[in-house]
Amino acid sequence: MKDMERMTKILWIASIVFIVLSGCTSPKAQQSELTLSGLNPINFETIVNGNQFTKLYTLKNSSGMEVCVTNFGGRIVSIMVPDKNGKMTDVVLGFDNITDYQNIPSDFGATIGRYANRINHGKIAIEGQEIQLPQNNFGHCLHGGPTGWQYQVYEASQVNDSTLILTMNSADGDNNFPGNVIARVIYTLTSDNAIDINYSATTDKTTVINMTNHSYFNLNGNPSQLATDNI
């Protein structure tokens, strides 16, 4: 009888252990499939401003090119293309997680807006009215101000393997720029290993718009070497 009770207890404990282990997820299972550039998409998932979700989107073409984009700032995170010897190489600088993009001031790969580059003394004149913009760079307005579009979350729609559409709404008075603006960026990979970036914007007031991408390139994929060494 004691042996029977002992066996029953062992089986009961074994069952509990099995259930607990079955409910656990191994570190390998928690990790998403890595991109060709070695990025883990999970490291780009977070919530900004309470209700805006960030993600990493992976674009590919028929030739094997891969481009990773996060909807935080519409940023290109990596571009994997074959070099002259056919070796796949990441030719842009960037971070491997969303936290660094949030906490380390940079324009790596970002979609810049409303206005790329500097506006002298942060002043513009529209329809006879002078508007004072934030002076966030030595007395001038740089890249749309301190909270430019490179720090905003875009709505993302990946329509196919090689095309991503990013959209954002910029309210009237955003960094003191006039007009409600709906901005759109379309990233498309072509079959000949090029990336096409198409910008468009609509507004309900006269305003200034000058969008661009702020990627930093190094063609041999090694940021410790000068780009001039590849020419």
Give the positions of each predicted feature.
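Intrinsically disordered, low-complexity regulatory regions of eukaryotic regulatory proteins
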Residues: 1-3, 31
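An exposed, glycine/acidic-rich loop-and-rim segment of catalytic or binding clefts
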Residues: 25-65, 71-231
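C-terminal motif of bacterial Sec signal peptides marking the signal peptidase cleavage site
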Residues: 21-23
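Hydrophobic helical h-region of N-terminal Sec-dependent signal peptides
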Residues: 15-18
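Bacterial N-terminal signal peptides that target proteins for export
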Residues: 3-12
